[in-house]
Amino acid sequence: MVAILCGIRGGDNKNGESKLAGKSAFNSDFNFNLYEYFHFCSKMLKKEDTKPLSRGRSSNSPCMIVFCAFEQLSTLINAAKKHGFVNYIPLVFVKNYSPQVLKANMRIVGATEYALVLYRDRLPKFRNGCIQDENGKNIRGTGHMIFNWFNWEKDAKDIPKIHPAQKPVAVIKKLIEIFTDEGDVVIDPCCGSGSTLRAAAELGRSAFGFEIDRNFYNRAKNEMLVFEKDKQLSIFDFYKNA
């Protein structure tokens, strides 16, 4: 599951802040219930993998990835624990630019994004290229170390810009490749632009998204999700044939 909590862009008033600073970015900002959100997500995730594990192997357990502001990390960690996500791995995404242009001569500017990998008891499924032999043992020389920081790769021009807090398809693809296998299911409960659904589909994963804003939903459907698709049954086909 890839979950996205949206932030606010910055850098265009006299204080070097966004003109939206202190204002609601989205209609749901002031009535977003974090605990209901985690309750919903905990129900959507599959159960823990209970099979015995070999030494040095990850389980097939699920995880939840939440993008957030640095200041929100502790709040999310505490809320997640109350819904069974007792473990976490912090992720940092490094940009080679900053939107805080007017702050450049005032202070150090922000050029990072943050996320949390939340999971229950067992470490989640982890794919780093490691190959096992016929006895289930890791083959030396396969697999590579994955750091907890990533480059923030901008999308090409063929990816439409729909949502103010849209995450690049290239970045989401990296996370999906690490924590899922082809054929697995990816769910985005705050779908926004639909970039998560596109990334999942291009990697051969099934994907479902939820979005309460009709404008973002329509734009995602008509602009983001118009690439070459396979023959996967859509929910609209399901109801049409029911």
Where are these regions (language model features)?
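Core catalytic lobe of class I
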Residues: M1-F210, N215-Y217
